[in-house]
Amino acid sequence: MIKPSTREEVLRALRDQLPYLHERFGIEEIAVYGSFIRGTHTEKSDVDLIVRLSRPLGLEFVSLAQYLEEVLGRPVDLATFETLQRSKSDPRRKRIADEIERSLSYV
């Protein structure tokens, strides 16, 4: 797969995979944040992703991350919306979680 080099290319690559991601992994929602959204990514940047799942994945979460890395041709940093919400309950992490939430670009 061609390595996406812009925000739009990352979003398009993920959008093209949405039906499969929903069927295989139960992804209901996926969003990008971080350097690709800010426009500060480099050739070596990973892609920061957050997903909402319809079911727990357990160890299959690793398979999801690996699949997304194949699709994007880059390492991914994968989190869930559930984790983001839990982070907001920790005063030390709330500011970062709020910043991530404000910057999300949904697929």
Model-derived segments and spans:
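Catalytic core of pol beta-like nucleotidyltransferases
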Residues: 1-28, 38-39, 43, 54-107
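Short beta-strand->loop micro-motif that forms the acidic, two-metal-ion catalytic signature
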Residues: 48-51
